[in-house]
Amino acid sequence: ESVTDHNETVKKSLELRGIKIKVKELPIPVAFAAAFEGEIIRKADMHNEMWSSKNPTAELVVMRNLDEITDHKINIIGPDFDQAKDLALATYVEVAGKKMQPDFESVIERKFHAWFNYMEGVMHTGQRNQVRVRVSNAAYDAGLRLKDFAEVLYVMIMDEFDAVVDKCQVTLITDAAEAEKFRDEMAMPRYNARDDRLASMTDESVDRYYTCILCQSFAPAHCCVVTPERLGLCGAVSWLDAKATK
């Protein structure tokens, strides 16, 4: 298999050989580490807020075919942090891979919480369409912008899920009307479909339960037991999500 456009030769060669290039240092203007997880940003120290109680929010990962997306493509639809204080935020990530499965979509979504919190000066809580994100004045002054959020998602997905993800494309929507349309027409139907699938299962119909420690960034001693009929206390991880990552 070959390409006629020689600008695509290296890219195609890596794809055919199954070679993946990993970014060792994130190209963002703030520090990135697990040590910042659990950082609280007070209102007085806040430059921007994306909160579902004020504006539409959603987080969604969708599996695509390899030829349907462009690797490392980043789209920003709407104003950036320097153009508005209170913003909507729809985080839409499209992934493709030979070993990717639909069950992994929600697993990747749940990781957004940790990855955003790893950024110094960023606080993230919630999931799905109930999200709150704050950006501190210090992070904004350092140069943190929406494209950096997208870079974090791309790099971390390609690093932690390299076994199943070959391509990743990120779209961030901060335009309120577009974010609301995305939430209602794209995200909510998919959330409901996942919930309906889980609703048909009972605790007695499975032979294994799972544990979740996602909230240990804020509650270090906490651990949830996840069953088909009982999610983690925060509601972020279902039994199917946990099963997909075992």
PLM features: residue spans?
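Cysteine-centered metal-binding/redox modules
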Residues: 1-246
